[in-house]
Amino acid sequence: DVVLACDVLEHLRAPEDVLQRLSDCVAPMGRLVISVPNIAYAGVVAAMRHGIFDYSDKGQLDRTHVRFFTKRSLEKVLLECGWSPRMWEANRLPVECSELAWCWNALSGDLRQALLAGWQDFDVYQWMVVVTPSADTPAWEVAEARNTADKLRDDLQALSVVHQRERGSLLEHQK
């Protein structure tokens, strides 16, 4: 039993309501497949760096999008609505090939490098995730997954800070 919600949640004012209702549509041990645009895509970040957040007829900033998600924010909503992520897939698109390429190309090479430092998912245009109802998962597994995710996020943030400092020091010594 699989329910598809591909490119749906970003069009809803209250996707939480739909996610909670969908749990009634999925048979025990069933799955929900979700895809959403990634608002943390480097092209969007580059546009915002230029002070631009203009809606368009298609793409990341489609004018019909009323909710925006990063991987982390989608994961949080899913967990809060009783869904457990089982498998993530990243739909990667080089920024230079996107509708936001001009914003990216207008940034200096140094600024692009600074933005990308320690950011492995900069080119994720869309996140896809397979989830199952949390009721099908032992409570300890959900808690363990949350703790592991929180620890990994904290570790990544700490490593990023150290990397930035070391990079800055290296650049300073190269002068």
Where are these regions (language model features)?
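S-adenosyl-L-methionine-dependent methyltransferase catalytic module, highlighting the catalytic core
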Residues: 2, 13-154
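Heptad-repeat positions
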Residues: 149, 156, 163, 167-170, ...
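Conserved Walker B
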Residues: 8-12
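Short SAM/SAH-binding signature in class I
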Residues: 1-7
